[in-house]
């Protein structure tokens, strides 16, 4: 099948690799523009662009598709199907209607749950036991199209968003490669989403990553897992210092007041209904360290307030 691929980050690059490996004809790739990265602001190509160029595939990087400026080019490419994975640009109706088989999108949640930019992170932040991937037939809405195929994945009790993202990427690439030939064969039955049960997964930011020791063990534990690797959960100590928490474990307590140090090896602190072991932290202005070293640096002892 002649496919036009649209995508930008690592998950899209892995899906594109899988489509190449499956022998599909990728007529062209659309991706976001190169952007400055890092402290030195080095102009860097999106992962999808790098994969496409390795395979000699034409790459297009328009600012937008919504103004119709790319319609003629896409029509000339004559794709039978457009595959979209985390592209970052909205497809107008004029593009959605161009290919014979329309446009499909890989979304890393069990739609209609977690429509939006950060479905993997919100599934962990909310303490869900499972998530999944969905392949949908795109329409003009935000992740509202009929679902062609979905597959569930269990979420581990200590799994971070980063770890889960690696797994859904692999599953998503596989499922996508199974769906494409099924579309050509006409063996799929699109299932309309239950819009009444839709939930949203908005983009994360650094301010959202804050938690308080007065909150529940479950909330803090989920927040630390869900904000890993970015933007990284953090709290403010009684002394006004910001501390990022990379890894933690939930433990029982004896009802001590939130913020009370329960132990220092490893550093364990009381919260609303239990205790949290702070296993890996990044104190404000310092390098990452384990919680025990952090406690030693502050000369904390059991009974102190962090």
What are these regions (language model features)?
Residues 1-39:
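N-terminal Rossmann-like dinucleotide-binding module
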Residues 21-22, 32, 81-200:
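Donor/substrate-binding cores of folate-linked one-carbon enzymes
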Residues 28, 61, 148-149:
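A structural microfeature
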Residues 178-237:
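Active-site-lining helix/loop region of Rossmann-like oxidoreductase modules
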Residues 7, 29, 52, 82, ...:
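A residue-level signal for conserved active-site and pocket-lining positions in enzyme catalytic cores
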Residues 213-306:
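An anion-binding loop in the catalytic cleft
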Residues 36-78:
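N-terminal glycine-/serine-/threonine-rich beta1-alpha1-beta2 phosphate-ribose binding loop
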